[in-house]
Amino acid sequence: DMGRQAARYRERRALPAGDAAHVHAPTGGQGLNIGVQDAVNLGWKLAQVVRGTSPSTLLDTYQAERHPIAARVLKLTMAQVALMRGDERTMALRENVQELLAMDQPRKRYGAMMSGLDIRYDFGEGHALLGRRMPDLDVVTADGPRRVSTLLQEARPVFLNLGEPSRFDIGAWTDRV
């Protein structure tokens, strides 16, 4: 297995992403997914720093958020490669894994791991959804219904009030959100 990962995701002005930050076996086709996720995570941060609306220390969060995700993918692909071996012990293990994947919950969990839909950034204590991926839902805006993904195309943070209308005063943030 040739899997490896950069120790640091930021060295002054160098910010590796995708295969420059981590390489692993192509098993499961996760390389493209994780590379795109790196780019999305880093892209909006770079835009904020270049525009001067966020300090350059924002780029330090790239390491904290993406490095653990890539380390997990490397372990997952290492396990997948190991399960391809043809020896008797691996074949026994593979049969046990197949039995587990015949069950609903293990199959859903593994599917989420393989697709990257289970990614959660660890921001500490708070709401259970903090750091989780937002589904691309239809939301109602002042301009009418829109998909969440269309709100993210301007490289600006998006504040979604999922509670009562006009409950939050974001006046101090209007130039950033």
Each predicted region: which residue ranges?
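Helical substrate-recognition/capping region of FAD-dependent monooxygenase/halogenase enzymes
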Residues: 48-177
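Short, solvent-exposed loop/helix junctions and linker helices
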Residues: 33-36, 87
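FAD/FMN-dependent oxidoreductases across multiple families
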Residues: 1-30, 34, 76, 115, ...
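Short amphipathic alpha-helical face segments that pack within enzyme cores
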Residues: 37-45
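Catalytic cores of eukaryotic secretory-pathway lumenal/extracellular enzymes that build
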Residues: 24-33, 40, 59, 69-73
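Hydrophobic alpha-helical membrane-insertion segments
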Residues: 28, 44-47
